């Protein structure tokens, strides 16, 4: 049974051993991630570490995450969150994670402190 939906920042915290990474590791074995957020993580690894996509895929596959495709339903759900999250500075990727969490009826797990101030009816756990 799945425990949460990971934001890119949460997975990047694990990869970089950043503050809060231990809280994320506790949830990794049952975590989901939206394909948008997986792409964000892959892009950061390519940019920061110069890894090839094959190397990134190999590295990320060790976490055995279940990837949720970002489909039309989630696209509209993420768009609907824009007016409610704009002032907090949330990105498209952030809204994709929140929309996925809402659709799966699971909490979102993030390292982004700005999410603490949100009142969206979506459970959010901040690891920092």
Residue ranges, per PLM feature:
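Short, well-structured N-terminal submotif of metal-dependent ribonuclease cores
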Residues: 1-33, 46-58
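Short active-site oxyanion
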Residues: 1-2, 28-31, 64-66, 103-107
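Histidine- and aromatic-rich ligand-binding microenvironments
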Residues: 6-7, 33-34, 90-92, 112, ...
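Alpha-helix capping/helix-boundary segments
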Residues: 10-11, 37-38, 74, 96-97, ...
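Active-site-proximal, substrate-binding regions of enzyme catalytic domains
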Residues: 38-68
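Active-site neighborhoods of divalent-metal-dependent phosphate/nucleic-acid chemistry enzymes
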Residues: 66-109
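Acidic, PIN/NYN-like endoribonuclease modules and their adjacent C-terminal/linker elements
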Residues: 98-128
